[in-house]
A protein has these predicted regions:
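Conserved GNAT acetyl-CoA-binding A-motif
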Residues: 108-120
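Conserved N-terminal entry element of GNAT/NAT acetyltransferase domains
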Residues: 1-22, 159-162
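A short, internal acetyl-CoA/4′-phosphopantetheine-binding micro-motif in the GNAT/acyltransferase core
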Residues: 83-94, 118
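Conserved acetyl-CoA-binding loop-helix of GNAT-fold acetyltransferases
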Residues: 95-108, 126, 130
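Conserved beta-hairpin
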Residues: 62-75
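Conserved catalytic-core motifs of GNAT/GCN5-like acyltransferases
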Residues: 116-118, 134-151
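Conserved GNAT-fold acetyl-CoA-binding loop/helix
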Residues: 22-24, 29-55
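A short helix-loop-beta-strand connector motif used in the catalytic cores of GNAT acetyltransferases and
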Residues: 55-65, 83
Length: 162
């Protein structure tokens, strides 16, 4: 049984999306809200520097799946080469299980086995550990060579829940 802090009243729709300009704008807005609510180690200037990379990644990542609840975008996950490249959930829906649903889709339907997590984001590292991921390497910089250390994680224990 899954435990969610908040009750989910209506079914969730999870599907791959067509990347229209409108869709990219909606995904970017969710990313912006989620990052500001969860990545407290980033200064405003850091977030501003990431914006062009985020827009590019949303358009170019191999597979992009969204979760909608009651018609509202509540989260998305981007995957490429068996790796989760991005997973963001609306702060209004933190703790509701949407991140887990998206991660399960990534593992089960897209064969994802890897993810990088910021060291300064222990909630994300704990989330992936609960799903069976383990750290196999540490990098002192992120993908843009910024001084934000990363934990490189691999799925090593796949439980029945995922």
């Amino acid at each position: 049984m899954l435990y969610f802090r908040k009750r989910i009243a209506r079914p969730t729709v999870v599907r791959e999306v067509e990347r229209t300009d409108e869709c990219i704008t909606e995904l970017f807005q969710l990313w912006n809200e989620s990052v500001r609510a969860s990545h407290h180690f980033l200064a405003e200037a850091d977030i501003e520097r990431l914006i062009p990379f985020v827009h590019q990644a949303l358009r170019s990542v191999e597979s992009l799946v969204v979760a909608r609840h009651g018609g509202r975008l509540v989260g998305f996950i981007g995957m490429e080469n068996r790796k989760i490249e991005m997973l963001f959930v609306s702060p209004d829906y933190f703790g509701c299980g949407f991140g887990r649903v998206l991660a399960e889709v990534a593992v089960r339907e897209y064969g994802c086995r890897y993810v990088d997590v910021n060291v300064q984001n222990p909630q994300a590292a704990d989330f992936y550990r609960r799903l069976g991921f383990r750290v196999f390497e540490r990098s002192e910089t992120d993908g843009q060579r910024n001084p934000f250390p990363l934990l490189r994680m691999e799925l090593v224990e796949c439980c029945n829940d995922i």
